[in-house]
Amino acid sequence: MTSEPRPTGRQAAAPGEAQIGRPKVVPKPWGEELWLAHTDRYAGKILAVKKGHRLSLQYHERKHEVQYIDSGRIKYTLGSSDRPGEYREFVAEAGTVVVLPPGTVHRMEALEDARFFEVSTPELDDIVRLEDDYGRAGPPAGRAGTSG
């Protein structure tokens, strides 16, 4: 007996039991996120960013991210939450891995349509927005907001 794939939930499959489904699609003003996994131990997403759009300038107090650029070119703006306003930029192309520990200020801008994978600790709402092109208000430091 077969069944249609369904959105995967927050809960991990029981030991020895596979979980088959479709990712949760989260529309964003800059593109979309496909949530592949979100458990109490880890999260995995694919982010698709439209050319010319960028995510918030942000940092996380607890969340640790690793990103893999699958396609396109992305301009990263990076800094430290301990040194406001001190940023450096670099362009990442397909095949690049970027590690963002807690406290790393970061922003990604798609120089062309781009897609990257993000594997992280599970704190998806741990975000402090410093700037945002889409008018989404950021919480003060120490309070959680919404991702991206």
Where are the regions that the model predicts?
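Glycine- and acidic-residue-biased ligand/ion/polar-headgroup-sensing regions
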Residues: 62-81
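Cytosolic regulatory regions built on CNB/CRP/Popeye-like sensor folds
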Residues: 2-24, 39, 87-89, 94
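Double-stranded beta-helix
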Residues: 10, 21-22, 26-27, 109-148
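Short acidic-glycine-tyrosine-enriched beta hairpin
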Residues: 80-103
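A short glycine-rich, His/Asp/Glu-containing loop-to-beta-strand
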Residues: 21-63
